Structures are given as C-alpha cells and as structure tokens.
Swiss-Prot record:
Tissue expression pattern: Red blood cells.
Species of origin: Rhinolophus ferrumequinum
Gene Ontology CC: blood microparticle; haptoglobin-hemoglobin complex; hemoglobin complex
Residues the record lists as Phosphoserine modifications: S45
Disulfides per UniProt: none
Subunit structure: Heterotetramer of two alpha chains and two beta chains.
PROSITE patterns: GLOBIN
UniProt gene name: HBB
Protein name: Hemoglobin subunit beta
Task of the protein: Involved in oxygen transport from the lung to the various peripheral tissues.
Keywords from the named record: Acetylation, Heme, Iron, Metal-binding, Oxygen transport, Phosphoprotein, S-nitrosylation, Transport
Organism lineage string: Eukaryota, Metazoa, Chordata, Craniata, Vertebrata
Residue list for modification N-acetylvaline: V2
Statement: the UniProt record of this protein carries the keyword Mitochondrion: no
Globin domain boundaries: 3-147
C-alpha cells in the first residue's frame, strides 16, 4: 500500500489524466532499455535493439510500453490495494519471466523522468514527490511474489 494524502492522490490522478499512455509508455520502456541495456535480455523477441535509435523506434517496445502504462493506470485506480492489483503480474514476472525485481524500481524512476520531461514546469517538486511514492509502491507490489 502506498500512503498518499488526499492532495497527493489528486496531484497524481490530475496529471495522469493528461498523459498520452501510447507515447509515454514507449518512451519510458525505450529509455529503460537504452540506459540499462542488461534489461534487453527480457525482450529477445522484440527484434532490433542494437542502438538507441533502434530501441526508441521499435514498434514492439512502444506497444509493450503502452501495455505497461495501461497496467500502471489500473494501479492508480487502486492505490489502496496495489499488492492485489499487481498480484498476477508479480507472479508472472517472478515465476515465468524471472525478471529481476530491481528492474521495476528502475522503470519507475525512468517513468518519473519521462513525465518530468513531458510536463516541464507543470511537473513541480510536489508532483515529483507524489509520483515517486507511487512508483515505489508499484515496484514493491510487483516484487511481492519474490519474497
């Protein structure tokens, strides 16, 4: 569970209503794969990931990034039950995909950076602090099955 004040919940959901999930999802996942290239091993079926340009232009990266942010959107609707919301994804990533749970934290941090880049001055320190709490909560929920 993530502990957000009513004001923080309003900040998070207010900004999220302006997020273009298609674009931001692809950008966030793409940046994760570029900045942390060892994460590419989980995406062998995505084709050419040989350069930053190839990753950022890859249709499968963009599509999966959208899928990731669609799940994140569900989490935002259930901030008081992130563990339950992400239970099946946690199990999938742990038992079948064997994803290092640290990658969830990395992706959350990249997402915060992408949001800051996209929203500029609107992404105030208060917005960043609220989103940082959320991405930590989501990463913790996704890592739950690993414990």
């Amino acid at each position: 569970m993530v502990h957000l004040t009513g004001e923080e919940k309003g900040i998070v959901t207010g900004l999220w209503g302006k997020v273009n999930v298609d674009e931001v999802g692809g950008e966030a996942l793409g940046r994760l794969l570029v900045v942390y290239p060892w994460t590419q091993r989980f995406f062998d079926s995505f084709g050419d990931l040989s350069s930053a340009a190839a990753v950022m232009g890859n249709a499968k990266v963009k599509a999966h990034g959208k899928k990731v942010l669609d799940s994140f959107s569900e989490g935002l609707k259930n901030l008081d039950n992130l563990k339950g919301t992400f239970a099946k994804l946690s199990e999938l990533h742990c038992d079948k995909l064997h994803v290092d749970p640290e990658n969830f934290r990395l992706l959350g941090n990249v997402l915060v950076c992408v949001l800051a880049r996209n929203f500029g001055k609107e992404f105030t320190p208060q917005v960043q602090a609220a989103y940082q709490k959320v991405v930590v909560g989501v990463a913790t929920a996704l890592a739950h099955k690993y414990h």
